[in-house]
């Protein structure tokens, strides 16, 4: 699928598709504001301006702040990768390496939050937690704040976040 999108870039077709999307979005916003009729919100086409493209999040959010100096990273994410626990064993360390390289500050601290407890019928969450744990063991200057005990079996987002924040703070302060 991505190859066909990449081919559209080369042919100039993507710009035409994106222009149609922008016009449709303007029409959607106008009709929504006027509440004249319900129409479905247009979907942004996959392509070079879509943040969901490969490395899109990095290019649209991280590259704009990477020139600034920082003391370390705090990363709290992973739910969208739960079905790829085995891949995450390589992807997560690679992401850490890439972020550190983008900032050019060596092996600055990279702290992250383990996925919390969440009741699911698959083993995926456990596999991803294991990949996170292995990363904390094998990637230099990383720390994992355990969140399993803070999770809510019925809600993907723990209600009480101060314990996880405290754990991250203790690691950041070297305690």
What is each PLM-predicted segment?
Residues 1-175:
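Cell-envelope and extracellular/periplasmic
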């Amino acid at each position: 699928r991505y190859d066909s999108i990449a081919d559209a870039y080369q042919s100039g077709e993507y710009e035409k598709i994106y222009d149609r999307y922008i016009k449709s979005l303007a029409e959607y916003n106008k009709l929504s504001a006027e509440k004249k009729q319900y129409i479905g919100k247009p979907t942004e086409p996959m392509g070079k301006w879509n943040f969901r493209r490969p490395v899109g999040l990095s290019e649209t959010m991280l590259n704009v702040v990477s020139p600034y100096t920082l003391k370390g990273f705090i990363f709290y994410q992973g739910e969208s990768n739960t079905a790829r626990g085995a891949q995450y064993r390589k992807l997560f360390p690679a992401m850490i390496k890439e972020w550190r390289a983008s900032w050019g500050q060596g092996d600055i601290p990279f702290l992250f939050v383990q996925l919390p407890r969440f009741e699911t019928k698959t083993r995926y969450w456990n596999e991803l937690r294991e990949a996170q744990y292995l990363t904390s063991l094998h990637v230099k200057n990383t720390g994992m704040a355990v969140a399993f005990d803070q999770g809510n079996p019925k809600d993907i987002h723990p209600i009480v976040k101060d314990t996880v924040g405290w754990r991250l703070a203790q690691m950041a302060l070297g305690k």
